[in-house]
Structures are given as C-alpha cells and as structure tokens.
From Swiss-Prot:
Residues 526-651 are annotated as: Disordered. GO terms for cellular component: cell surface; endoplasmic reticulum; extracellular region. Keywords: Endoplasmic reticulum, Glycoprotein, Secreted, Signal. It comes from the Eukaryota. Its main location: secreted. Residues 1-19 form the signal peptide. This is Serine/threonine-rich protein adg2. Glycans are attached at residues 77, 159, 204, 224, 274, 297, 327, 351, 370, 381, 405, 424, 435, 459, 478, 489, 513. It is found in: Secreted; Endoplasmic reticulum. The keyword Zinc does not apply. InterPro entries: GPI-anchor_Adhesion_Reg. Transmembrane segments: none annotated.
C-alpha cells in the first residue's frame, strides 16, 4: 500500500520534463543527527542549473519541511551540513526550483535519522520471530501466549485512532507477556449477574521497559421502568408481596479502557490502528402500584385527605370521576372533568347564576345593584308585591312593609325582612320572601362570591372559598362549568364539567396515575400498599468492534468483534484476518467464539487457518452452584499447543501480533 501524497504527484509530473534523480540517500539509509552526510544525484542536459535542497518528513505527524541550501545541479554531489535533527523515520531529500518551491525536480527514498549520542547499529540477518500458543483446560483454567516482536509505543483510549512510531538499534527483540483475570458473580435473581475483568501487558526491551493495565467492572440495576425508578425503600419487610424489590439501588460502573507504555526507540516502521465500537443497550420492564388509601378521581387529585376517605387509583390521564367527602377538609385546585357531592348542616339557597352574599342567622338576605327593569311596586302594611317585565319579576311579603315603586330593588331592609342586592344585569327572575325564607329561581348568567356561617354554597362558575371546620370546604381556580345547584336544610349538591389537573399528597400514602409511576418513599405506619414489578427488567447489549492496523505498508490486520449480552448469556465472536499488500494473499485467519451463560457454564472455540496449517480447538466448563463461577471448573483436562515457524519479511512480526490479539479474549473466558 503506497502512500499517495501531493508531493509524490508533483514528482511524477516533474519527471516527464526532467531527468534529475537523487541516488544518496536511498531508501532505508540511516543518518546521524549532528553529522555531515553525503548527497549524490544524476542529471541530464535539459535539467536546470541550480536547485534548492529541502529536508522533509510527511510520515511523522505533523509533517515537517526545512530549507537546507542551494546547489549547482551539474556538480552531481554535495555535503549535507551537520545539523541538529529530530530522530525518526520517514525523512526525504527534495530538490525544488529556486523560483518556486512547489516545483519539485527530484525526491529521495525514505530514510532514518538517529540521535547523535552514539547509538550503535548492528547489521545482521533478517529479524525472525517465533510465536507459541498454549491452551489448557484444568481446574485453574489458564491460557497464555508470548511472542518476540519489534518494540512499539501504543496509547489506547476508547473510541480513538491509535498512532505510534518508534526507532531502536539492531538487533531488536521485545518480550510481551499478557495476563488477564475475570471473576463473575452469579446468584439467583435478583440481582442480575455482575462481572469484573482485568487486563495487563508488560513490554520489555533492551532499552526501556513499560507496563499497563486496566480493570472494567459492570453490573445492572434491579429496575428500569418507563420513566421512573425508586430512589429509596424504607422497609422491604412491609412489602413482602413484591416479586422483585431491592433494599438499595444497584448502580453500574465502567472504567474506560486505557493501555499505555513509555516511548521507545526502534527501527520499526510506523503502525496505524483504528478501533471503532458501535452498539446499543436496551432495558425493558414494567411496574404496577396497588394501594389501599385515599382517592378516586379522574384528572384532578385532592392535595390532602384523611385516612377515612376512599382510595385512589388511576391508569389513564383522561376520565370522569366522583369525589365524596364527609366532615373533612378537602382542597381542590385545577381544571378538569369531574363531579362532587358535599354534605353540610344546614344550607340555605338554591339558584342558577346569582347567589346571596349575606344572610342573617335566621332569615335569608339578598342584595342587588341591578338597574335595568320595568317595575310596578305595590305596598301595604303587611305586604310588598313587585312585578315587572323585561328582565325579571319578584314578589316580597313582609310585616310590616316598607317601600314605594322604583326601578331598583331596595338595598336595605330591617332584620325581619329580606334585602336584595345584585350586580347581575341579565336574567329572568321570580323572587318570594317571608320572615324566614327567601327562594330565588331563575335562568341567566352571572357571578358572585359569598361567605356565610354556618353554611356554604356552590354555583355555576364560582365555588365557595370558606366553610366552618365541621363542613367540607372546596376551592377551585376553574372558571368554566355548566352547573345546576339545589339546596335543602342539609345538602348541597354540585355537578359540573371542565378540565384541570392537580397533585395529590397525604400523610401515609402513595399513588399512581397516568401510566407507570413508582413511589419514591414507602412509610411503614398505617395501611401501606405493596409494590410489585413484573416482569423483571432485562438488559441486553449488542454491538460490533472493528480493529484494523497496517505496518510497513506491507501487511494489514483486520479484527471484527461481534458481541451480544443479556441476563441469560454473553456471546463474543472475534475474527482476525491478516493480509499482505495484495488482498488476495491471506497470511492467516483466526476466529474465536466464546459464550458464558447465566448459570455459569461457558464454552469457547478457536479456528486458526494458515497457508500450511489449521488449528481448531473447543473448550467448555460448567461452574458449580456457588456464587463465584470462577471457583469451580470441569474436571476434564485438555491442552493444545502450536508453534509457527518464522517466515521471511517484515510481515512476520505483525502476523504474530495479530495471533496474540485474537487469543487474548479467550483469557477472559477463564
């Protein structure tokens, strides 16, 4: 896989019209920082007389370029000055036009620059490596793998792209050992299974040792309803009928995976690795709350009711409700559809749209400021009769009488006679009064506010605001009803329609409405509802990880991981394919599948295919009934080992790395 760069394209275009070619340095040459180095090139007669010399590096990040000097091209050699240069790989010499540096005449191969402290370079045979894999299934359940590879420096963070570049002296050899451990707690639900996995690496070279490790702990909470989760349960003993009820909330934690090592120096070409993980977690569940306290309504809920009032249940946000209360204090706020019945002793009036504002203790009174009537008023010593046309008529009877005719009804009468005041201007009315009773009937629209002692009343759009302690009180901010009010000495009945909402609280309850709401506090005193959750919540995760890496532009390793987790089992499948620069030439394919069930049993299968050999292995074990599944394994014992002969070429080390990466997940199984 050859890197395509803008400079490379310009070189190709320049070579069409010029024959200049750089011979020294060549590919894989090694220069030393702070030393004089030779430059050699060849020209043809059509080449320019002069050129600028640049030192560039497009492999390292960020790319660099540095002007060095101007040369006479037909000299065909020059001396590169002793400069302080950063050690690394990917350097090139570039000859450009003295008038326009974007015009490139020639460019050298890629070479190395090492530090000037005297690091030696030892030439020898081509680097060879041997990879050995040994797997055994015994009571301890352990697997290990080791290999010799070029030293590298890699830093990994979750969902990131990994780049590393390092150089060191020949010969180079790195020992890598990998150890993993896992402990899985399996108990009878609840709670769900939780697990802790750890992974560590130790990398030692002749120059710099390094090590890294990470630990991941996962768990699941007991519940996950549609939108609410209990925050505390005071006493689980009082909720013995529940099917799955925790005494505390279990949280799930996860530590990001981080693998790091010290910076190393080696001649190993750059590696580039990309790891991408995608997936989703789904948790389902439902809960039902049943209780034996306090209310029954549709969409408006009392805020306070004593324990003697009916129970409240709700499974919808739109319904019709009847609320009944006796000798209690009920506060009603909100708008909504509903009806209610109030009982008091004694009440006084019946009307449609206008209600008396003041009544003596023994005689009803009625006041009105209405000024629009056509009236005839007749008075004698014993009676007053009022009749009219237009907006209303009325008859008054009293002893003795008081008035003459006018268009406004009297606003003041002695205590033994009714009084009438009204702010309503539109109704048809007949009014009859005696020393003890005022009866008013009529139709129309209006509004009024009244306070009386000892009774209270309701009308079409305004509800009483105050009542004595022995009688229910009712307040409302609702202003839209259609109402019929009837009163006798003992009963006031109010019915109406509208819309509204409210919030209910009480001294020892909890409630449910709309869809699924789980109580946040349960009191152990009094009559407490039970809590049940059914079915038990389940969590599952499915996703795919893709890991690809390349080295030395000759090999490519691709790892695909597919995994699915649920309370029943966890299955992970990893397939790693290593290819040369030609995709049709597959160096190796390794597939690993591992499954761990809820009961503690596990199995794994590995199939590795190489041009000359194939390895297949299947292992399984079943835990005992103890809490820790890692404490017991099958008594059977099986082991397999494989040694791969070294192969020529720089792809050998990557091939071994790929094999090691594939076998690592097997260690988590045991």
């Amino acid at each position: 896989m050859r890197r395509l760069t803008i400079s490379g394209l310009l070189i190709s275009l320049a070579k069409l019209c010029a024959g200049m070619e750089i011979n020294v340095p060549s590919s894989s040459d090694v220069w030393t920082s702070g030393h004089i180095e030779p430059l050699e090139w060849s020209v043809v007669s059509t080449d320019p007389l002069q050129a600028n010399v640049w030192l560039i590096n497009e492999v390292e990040y960020p790319p660099t370029s540095r002007y060095i000097m101007t040369i006479n091209t037909f000299d065909e050699n020059a001396t590169f000055p002793a400069l302080d240069l950063s050690p690394g790989y990917g350097y090139q010499i570039s000859f450009t036009s003295i008038r326009d540096d974007s015009v490139i005449y020639a460019q050298s191969g890629t070479f190395y620059i090492v530090g000037g402290e005297g690091i030696s370079s030892t030439t020898g045979s081509t680097f060879q490596s041997m990879t050995t894999f040994t797997s055994s299934q015994t009571n301890s359940g352990h697997a290990s793998a080791s290999t010799s590879i070029p030293s590298t420096a890699i830093t990994v963070t979750a969902n990131s792209t990994i780049y590393s570049s390092a150089t060191s002296s020949f010969p180079y050899s790195t020992d890598v050992s990998v150890s993993t451990g896992t402990s899985t707690d399996i108990v009878t639900l609840p709670p769900p299974a939780s697990s802790t996995s750890s992974f560590s690496t130790i990398t030692n070279t002749s120059m710099i040792p390094s090590s890294s490790s990470f630990t991941t702990t996962t768990g699941s909470p007991y519940y996950n309803t549609s939108s609410f989760l209990p925050s505390s349960v005071i006493s689980s003993a009082s909720l013995s009928s529940s099917s799955v009820l925790p005494t505390s909330i279990i949280t799930s934690t996860s530590t990001p995976v981080t693998v790091s090592s010290s910076s190393l120096s080696s001649f190993t070409p750059s590696y580039s690795t990309n790891l991408t993980t995608t997936g989703s977690t789904t948790t389902t569940g439902s809960a039902t709350v049943s209780s034996s306290p306090f209310y029954s309504n549709s969409s408006v809920i009392p805020t306070s009711v004593p324990s003697s009032v009916s129970s409240f249940t709700s499974s919808s946000s739109s319904y019709t409700t009847t609320l009944t209360a006796s000798n209690t204090s009920v506060t009603y706020t909100g708008t909504g559809t509903g009806s209610a019945t109030f009982t008091s002793s004694p009440p006084f009036y019946s009307n449609s749209s206008v209600i008396p504002t003041s009544v003596p203790s023994s005689v009803s009174s009625f006041t009105s400021s209405n000024s629009s009537y056509t009236t005839t008023l007749t008075a004698s010593n014993t009676s007053i009769t009022y009749t009219g046309t237009g907006t209303g008529s009325a008859t008054f009877t009293s002893s003795p009488p008081f008035y003459s005719n006018s268009s406004v009804i009297p606003t003041s009468v002695p205590s033994s006679v009714s009084s009438f005041t009204s702010s309503n201007s539109s109704y048809t009315t007949t009014l009859t009064a005696s020393n003890t009773t005022v009866t008013f009937t009529g139709t129309g629209t209006g509004s009024a506010t009244f306070t009386s002692s000892p009774p209270f009343y309701s009308n079409s759009s305004v509800i009483p605001t105050s009542a004595p302690s022995s009688v229910s009180s009712f307040t409302s901010s609702n202003s839209s009803y259609t109402t019929t009010l009837t009163a006798s000495n003992t009963t006031v009945t109010f019915t109406g329609t509208g819309t509204g909402s409210a919030t209910a609280t009480s001294s020892s309850p909890y409630y449910s409405n709309s869809s699924i709401i789980v109580p946040t506090t349960v009191s152990t005193s009094g009559s407490v509802s039970s809590f049940s959750s059914s079915p038990s919540p389940t969590s599952s995760f499915s996703g795919t990880s893709a890991l690809s890496s390349s080295s030395n532009e000759e090999t490519t390793t691709t790892t695909q991981v597919t995994y699915t987790t649920s309370p029943e089992e966890t299955t992970t499948t990893m397939t790693t394919t290593t290819c040369s620069s030609r995709p049709e030439e597959t160096i190796s394919t390794v597939s690993t599948t591992s499954t761990v069930s809820e009961s503690g049993s596990s199995s794994a299968s590995i199939t590795s295919t190489y041009p000359s050999s194939t390895l297949s292995m299947t292992t399984s074990h079943l835990s005992s009934s103890s809490v820790h599944s890692s404490s017991a394994h099958s008594s059977s014992s099986r082991s397999s080992s494989m040694s791969l002969p070294p192969s020529a070429g720089s792809s050998t080390s990557l091939q071994r790395i790929s094999l090691l990466c594939v076998f690592i997940p097997l260690l988590f199984l045991f």
